[in-house]
Structures are given as C-alpha cells and as structure tokens.
Amino acid sequence: MVLSPNQNQKIINPIEESPTVTQELSENIVLTTVDDLYNWAKLSSLWPLLYGTACCFIEFAALIGSRFDFDRFGLVPRSSPRQADLLITAGTITMKYTPTLVRLYEQMPEPKYVIAMGACTITGGMFSMDSPTAVRGVDKLIPVDVYIPGCPPRPEAIIDAVIKLRKKIANDSLQERGQLQQTHRYYCVKHNMKVVEPILTGQYLQTSDRKAVPKELAEAIGMPVSPALQAIPKEEVSLG
C-alpha cells in the first residue's frame, strides 16, 4: 500500500494544526462573571468537617483510602470548624450532641454546606423508635443541602452527593446566597412522648437520718449529741 505525499504528511505530523500561543489580545481574554469565578474556585476546594457518631462514618473512612480517593474533588478534611465550609454528619444525632453540633455549624464561615449521611442522621433511623434521646432528622437543627439515604450508604453514594453539591455550588449567586432558606425537609415521624413525673425528687434528702446523726451512732463515735436527741428517751431492749 502506497500513501500519497499529503496522506503521509498527515500521519507523520498529526498535530500540525494544533493551537499555539499567540500575542493577539482576543485570544488571551476570558469573559466570565464574579459569581462563576467564585463558584469555580469554591467547588474545587471544599474542606469538610467530619462529624461521625456511628457506623456510617466507617463507610466514609473507606472513601479516604486510595480505592475511591476523594482528594480528586479537592476535599481536604479539617479539624477546626473555622477552617471548614462543609459539614458531613454521619450517624445518630442525640439530644446530648445537639448543642455541640449547632455550635460547630455556627462557627463555620459563610458560605457553608451540610451533607446528611445515613438514615439515622436523616430520620433518626432504628434508634428513634420509642427513644426520647435520638433526634429524628438533623434538619430540625441545621439546614441540609444534600441527603444520602442508606444504612449505611456506600462510598459511591457519597461521591454522588459531592458531585450534586458541586453542581449546586456552581449555580449559586453571591447576592442571593444570604436570602436562600431551606423549604423542604425529609419526612420523619414526630415524637409521641408521654410526660411522667420525675423519679429523682430529692425526698430522700429530707429524712430524719439525713438531717441529723442518730443518737446511738453519735454516742458510739464520741460526737456531741444535740439537745433534741438528748430529749428522746432511750429504748430499752429486752433480751429475754
């Protein structure tokens, strides 16, 4: 098979018409907006704050490994909320965790985003059945941007949630960001708790033995006996 000179030249030099750097002004200008530039830099450098409280965090730990490699999305875990802009809640949220979680969210700088990972975080999961301590939905405390259902969700689902969050950030606007509020919540069952009287009422502190040492014990250890105890007649014990 004999190739013509033109065909041979195309095969030998396939990048003959490749773009080159020119000095023309029109070829070195990029037209964009401040929102697009800001969102492009933001979605490529998300710094998450990991708030793992249960088994869902084990699946997230697998995401950090080399098999899934979430560093390709620019995710750099931070240990301080003041350096993070993404809060990932993984696991059951209890009433005792509530003040800590809200404080961490308030310490994060704007703009900040939240990913709710797992059924326990979204609706309370199996721990919310007849439990007065489990919070049925973290969106009752802080606004949530992306939900990841599952018990627990796989690392691929977390990657999909990060991609969806990046698309949401790409459409954000600096002027409208402070006005946006969460309008929809994940469905969850409300708490139906019965109010009962407290068990620890403090009545045991008002017994006579707590107010004063018994007369027999005071005499045995050599303590001074109060006049009120001295007025009590000593009981005679019959031994036979």
Curated annotation (Swiss-Prot):
Residues holding [4Fe-4S] cluster: C55, C56, C120, C151
Catalytic activity, as annotated: a plastoquinone + NADH + (n+1) H(+)(in) = a plastoquinol + NAD(+) + n H(+)(out); a plastoquinone + NADPH + (n+1) H(+)(in) = a plastoquinol + NADP(+) + n H(+)(out)
InterPro entries per UniProt: NADH_UbQ_OxRdtase-like_20kDa, NADH_UQ_OxRdtase_20Kd_su
Compartment annotation: Cellular thylakoid membrane
Keywords noted in UniProt: 4Fe-4S, Iron, Iron-sulfur, Membrane, Metal-binding, NAD, NADP, Plastoquinone, Quinone, Thylakoid, Translocase, Transport
Membrane-protein topology: Peripheral membrane protein
Domain of life: Bacteria
One Pfam family named in its UniProt record: Oxidored_q6
Enzyme class: translocase
SUPFAM superfamilies membership: HydA/Nqo6-like (SSF56770)
Cofactor dependence: [4Fe-4S] cluster
Cofactor note as given: Binds 1 [4Fe-4S] cluster.
Keyword Transport: yes
Gene Ontology terms, MF aspect: 4 iron, 4 sulfur cluster binding; iron ion binding; NADH dehydrogenase (ubiquinone) activity; quinone binding
GO cellular component, as recorded: plasma membrane-derived thylakoid membrane; respiratory chain complex I
Gene Ontology BP terms: aerobic respiration; electron transport coupled proton transport; photosynthesis, light reaction
Enzyme Commission number(s) of this protein: 7.1.1.-
Similarity comment: Belongs to the complex I 20 kDa subunit family.
Described purpose of this protein according to its UniProt entry: NDH-1 shuttles electrons from an unknown electron donor, via FMN and iron-sulfur (Fe-S) centers, to quinones in the respiratory and/or the photosynthetic chain. The immediate electron acceptor for the enzyme in this species is believed to be plastoquinone. Couples the redox reaction to proton translocation, and thus conserves the redox energy in a proton gradient. Cyanobacterial NDH-1 also plays a role in inorganic carbon-concentration.
UniProt name for this protein: NAD(P)H-quinone oxidoreductase subunit K
The organism of origin for this protein: Trichodesmium erythraeum (strain IMS101)
